[in-house]
Amino acid sequence: MKVLSSLKEAKNRHRDCQIVKRRGRIYVICKSNPRFKARQGGAKNRNKG
């Protein structure tokens, strides 16, 4: 799965790709060709202090 800052091009890679939102993150899933999976956003800073 790729981590991308923008999913605009990722959703147009294949006609079966669809965007879903799970647990506050946006994913592109493609059941017919799983190599097109992608997620938007990076890691959060958890150890602020």
UniProtKB/Swiss-Prot annotation:
GO CC, alphabetical: ribonucleoprotein complex; ribosome
Superkingdom field: Bacteria
Gene Ontology terms: biological process: translation
Gene Ontology molecular function, alphabetical: structural constituent of ribosome
Record keyword Ribosomal protein present: yes
Pfam (any one): Ribosomal_L36
InterPro entries, A to Z: Ribosomal_bL36, Ribosomal_bL36_sp, Ribosomal_L36_bact
Keywords associated with the record: Ribonucleoprotein, Ribosomal protein
PANTHER family in the cross-refs: 50S RIBOSOMAL PROTEIN L36 2, LARGE RIBOSOMAL SUBUNIT PROTEIN BL36B
Entry similarity comment: Belongs to the bacterial ribosomal protein bL36 family.
Protein's name according to its UniProt entry: Large ribosomal subunit protein bL36
